[in-house]
Amino acid sequence: MQVKSIPYGINFKYKIWGVCFMVNKKLVAAGVVMSIFAGSLVGCGGSSEEGNGGNSTQIYFLNFKPEIADVYKSVAKDYEKETGVKVKVETAASGDYEQTLKSEMAKSEAPTIFQINGPVGYNNWKNYCLDLKDTDLYSHLSDKSLAVTDGDGVYGIPYAVEGYGIIYNQEIMDKYIALSNKKTDITSVDDINNFDVLKEVVEDMQANKDKLGIDGVFASTSMASGNRWRWDTHLANLPFYYEFKDESQDDASIIETGLASDTVEFEYNDNYKNIFDLYLDNSCTEKGLLGNKSVDDSMSEFALGKCAMVQNGNWAWSQIKDVNGNVVKQDDIKFLPIYTGVDGEENQGICIGTENYFAVNSKASEEEQQASIDFINWLFTSDTGKAYVVGDLGFIAPFDTFNEDERPSDPLSGQVMEWMEKDNIKNVNWIFQSFPSEKFKETFNDALLEYVQGTQDWSYVVKTVKDAWKSEKAQ
């Protein structure tokens, strides 16, 4: 099983979808032939009917991303208009996808399309993952090695490349750079290329927050239950990326090193602490209140201009633009790498990869499986579907069905693509798919919360993380 960074496909192909009709042949009386005939025409759109009841097979998609839940519902409506096939879209609460999936899979009408987060996710759900190697969508995947595979089978197809880092508001940064009394000598955000410079700038901005019109440099470090994934997953990716990189022969084997590691040293824990403390100490919210703060709170603070920076990914654009009273201009939203003080980080980029893999339920009926495959294929090959992908969904899709003009229009996805194309920059691979379990992340989070609240010191966090990795790997 292998996961790599995903290139953006530029070749263009368009698949024309045919329309087929089925006629109910059970006629009750000659006098009602025409009315029954008219009422029994059903556009199949690649799916089939269940028995003779005239009800089209329904697709059930369990969505992972709350921030685009409404978009997927619009997608479902348009798909039904074009094909006559209904798509039920349900969305798990933030941080609760795995538990929600377990609950939904136990029901008689289980999801027909769900998401796995890479090799570990596949290992948990391998008995429910259909082999997709013969599907059209897999044939359009730009690099076949990007899929989650097991033997000759393909069980997870990546559908989006994403990136995260420190999102900043260029307008506020320009105000800081123009300050006559600033203690740093930066003349551009480009001068911030390591942790030492970042720390110096952030602390000086915090000291000048009133002049800058902000409550703090960073948005709230959200520590409410279900809202800590930015710290146990995304921020934690960096220290473990560097630890596994030190033990790997090349970049391609970093995630395999993590998957094979029964123990970790958490060697770069001080680097994690560097940036985490910087977030906490220069926030628009006091530490004692962070236990009740959500990701939505953080994004609202940024959108309303209460802070200059927030750690998040390109998916956050929808959260920013939809905030009532948003004051951040689209052209002012940019990415900085998450610098932590690692040697040579001047050439480090943002974190780019994917944890987004579509899987189709192997326990569903053949009709439901085919209908689900057809829907996913439509999303990435039809004009309507692709318009959603590069528009409201904002995906950087890894398929050859998109040409150079079909790129996401939102600023953060555009930033990800710019970082992918920078010379002499090494973006950080996503390797958190190698983390042993959701319980490991929860344990990590609980220790972080105690650290934030001042009831435990940092050494407790380090020990907890190392012990949790070992115990979860032993399961």
Across the structure, where does each feature detected by a protein language model lie?
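Conserved N-terminal structural module of periplasmic/extracytoplasmic solute-binding proteins
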Residues: 6-10, 16-18, 23-31, 38-121, ...
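A local structural motif
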Residues: 57-58, 82-91, 109, 181-190, ...
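Extracytoplasmic/periplasmic substrate-recognition and gating elements
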Residues: 82, 86-87, 324-394
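Short helix-initiation/N-cap motifs at beta->coil->alpha
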Residues: 91-100, 193-197, 289-304
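Hinge/lid segment of periplasmic solute-binding proteins
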Residues: 117-174, 332-338
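Extracytoplasmic/periplasmic solute-binding protein
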Residues: 153-159, 196-260
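Glycine-centered hinge/linker elements that transmit conformational signals in sensory
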Residues: 200-203, 246-292
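C-terminal capping/gating helix-and-loop segments adjacent to ligand/active sites or protein-protein/ligand interfaces
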Residues: 352, 394-402, 414-470
